[in-house]
């Protein structure tokens, strides 16, 4: 069951009866409507400036001028800030799952955050939680679930898994070697 406002049928829309096109909104109403839509989109989830711009323009009912007005108002009110968004997004993702710098940079690029802003946010996030600590957590979790890699195929599988998580090649090689060389703990000892 859908919640929210009921949509009127085509017969009930203003100006559309008898095949006439709808009247365009006056600029003031268009700006207010775009601002209202932007606030709803931000209430659903945090977004970057460009991501929000794209969402507002995608339906075609908002023009560039009213979108620019809405974005400037939201920045003025402090609701829209790419630096804060990038840092919050990156720290949340790292706390949820150990991810490497490359993966987070790619995710922020997908969210349309500028490279400079993303790099600054990643620098702060990885100062709090170093990448070495994250890759160690990722390896420990994988070993807990699948056991220590015994064959070349299992080692490659672990390596590929860490690459997908976005860790650098050199760091993966070093940590996988450390994990392979580490003596296995006896599970039967108490």
Question: Which role fits each region the language model picked out?
Answer:
Residues 1-190:
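An alpha-helical, amphipathic repeat domain used for nucleic-acid recognition
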């Amino acid at each position: 069951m859908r919640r929210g406002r009921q949509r009127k049928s085509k017969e009930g829309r203003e100006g559309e009866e008898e095949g006439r096109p709808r009247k365009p909104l006056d600029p003031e109403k268009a700006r207010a409507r775009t601002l209202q839509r932007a606030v709803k989109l931000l209430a659903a989830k945090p977004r970057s400036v460009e991501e929000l711009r794209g969402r507002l323009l995608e339906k075609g009912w908002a023009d560039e001028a009213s979108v620019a007005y809405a974005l400037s108002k939201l920045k003025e009110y402090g609701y829209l800030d790419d630096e804060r968004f990038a840092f919050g997004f990156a720290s949340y993702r790292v706390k949820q799952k150990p991810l490497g710098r490359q993966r987070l940079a790619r995710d922020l690029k997908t969210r349309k955050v500028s490279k400079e802003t993303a790099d600054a946010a990643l620098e702060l996030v990885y100062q709090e939680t170093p990448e070495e600590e994250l890759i160690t957590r990722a390896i420990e979790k994988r070993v807990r679930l699948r056991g220590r890699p015994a064959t070349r195929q299992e080692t490659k599988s672990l390596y590929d898994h860490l690459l997908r998580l976005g860790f650098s090649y050199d760091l993966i090689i070093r940590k996988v070697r450390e994990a392979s060389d580490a003596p296995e703990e006896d599970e039967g000892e108490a």
